Amino acid sequence: MAFTLTNKNVVFVAGLGGIGLDTSKELVKRDLKNLVILDRIENPAAIAELKAINPKVTVTFYPYDVTVPIAETTKLLKTIFAQLKTIDVLINGAGILDDHQIERTIAVNYTGLVNTTTAILDFWDKRKGGPGGIICNIGSVTGFNAIYQVPVYSGTKAAVVNFTSSLAKLAPITGVTAYTVNPGITRTTLVHKFNSWLDVEPQVAEKLLAHPTQPSLACAENFVKAIELNQNGAIWKLDLGTLEAIQWSKHWDSGI
């Protein structure tokens, strides 16, 4: 079902980083009512730029680390709901690429995403009288086929795809729909230099960037198109400037 972003309230976790910032720029062009950015480090210049692109959109920043206990996330969301009354879309975009930091990679890329999603269900779940909502989780093409030199990062992205696919199937119960956007190799600071697991490939970043990549802006444009297409359960691949819905192969079914 097509979705218009005009006059909507969007909460964007990590909306100031590489792909995140370019996506935020595309979002404000869609005449949102509110764009609420939750990020670890404030960037006043970026916030000012977003406001200048479309002064009609209210852009608000809250400091947020996705690794905090879920109770703190719920408290922050309560503040945001009190101010906006409604939130239409949650974008979970926090991510790091450094397989030296095993625990933090899992905490940021997966656990934090799960916790933020779980927290907003307190407000959205129709079983609690909530209105439902839309969750857009940022995965990666490494969730389809791993970059084997960074198995921890790739594993977290595979987990995001599976978690989000489960959320989509739960939509009739919760009223909350969900899908993933999965960028291919995109020219951002994230991939300029990073560590492989156990240093199995010291030149992993250089070797990766020797292959075709896409600019962050092209990825961001397709990111927003995916939001507007609003297909519950979609697994979007955003690679080399294209947007494609992946048809996942089923090799097993629980039968329940």
UniProtKB/Swiss-Prot annotation:
Signal peptide positions on this chain: none
Record-stated family: Belongs to the short-chain dehydrogenases/reductases (SDR) family.
Cellular component per GO, a single term: cytosol
Matching PROSITE patterns: ADH_SHORT
SUPFAM superfamilies: NAD(P)-binding Rossmann-fold domains
Keyword NAD found: yes
Keyword Ion transport: no
Native source species: Drosophila teissieri (Fruit fly)
Gene3D superfamilies reported in the protein's UniProt record: NAD(P)-binding Rossmann-like Domain
UniProt name for this protein: Alcohol dehydrogenase
